[in-house]
């Protein structure tokens, strides 16, 4: 399976809220980097390994209801994949609805995701936390 297909499958599973299934093609030592100021989001920082990545995603799911998860554009760069994603969310604690736009950069090696780097609107994130 090509890297772009692996990432597309992950996004579909995540959109379907199959969080564990979304990570099926992640290496055990996958690195997830969420680029942000940790003072703005408790989810910012780096997760090392599939279990930490899963824990981070489950924590997000506890804080937010994901109403729609839309990969707007996915760019195939061979073993590198870039994507713009639009996430329609509700903060569970406040009921506030918003749309978070993210840029994700994936690295795939030997059919497994080994790294994901995510950038997002930090000002928006700070306003909803």
Residue ranges and their predicted role:
Residues 3-4, 42, 88:
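A short, structure-level motif marking secondary-structure boundaries and short turns
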Residues 59-129:
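A beta-strand edge to alpha-helix "cap/lid" segment located at domain peripheries
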Residues 6, 53-56, 83:
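C-terminal ligand-sensing/allosteric alpha-helical core of TetR-family HTH transcriptional regulators
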Residues 21, 27-78:
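A solvent-exposed, acidic/Ser-Thr-rich amphipathic alpha-helical stretch
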Residues 1-28:
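Short, low-complexity N-terminal intrinsically disordered segments enriched in polar/charged residues
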Residues 9-12, 43, 115:
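Short, flexible active-site loop motifs that bind/organize anionic cofactors or intermediates
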């Amino acid at each position: 399976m090509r890297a772009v297909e692996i990432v597309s499958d992950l996004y579909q599973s995540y959109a379907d809220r199959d969080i564990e299934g979304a990570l099926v093609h992640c290496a055990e030592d996958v690195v997830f980097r969420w680029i942000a100021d940790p003072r703005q989001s408790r989810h910012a920082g780096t997760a090392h390994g599939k279990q930490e990545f899963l824990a981070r995603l489950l924590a997000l799911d506890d804080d937010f209801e994901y109403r729609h998860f839309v990969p707007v554009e996915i760019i195939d760069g061979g073993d590198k994949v870039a994507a713009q994603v639009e996430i329609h969310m509700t903060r569970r604690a406040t009921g506030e609805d918003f749309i978070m736009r993210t840029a994700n950069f994936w690295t795939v090696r030997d059919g497994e995701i080994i790294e994901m780097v995510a950038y997002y609107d930090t000002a928006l994130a700070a306003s909803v936390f």
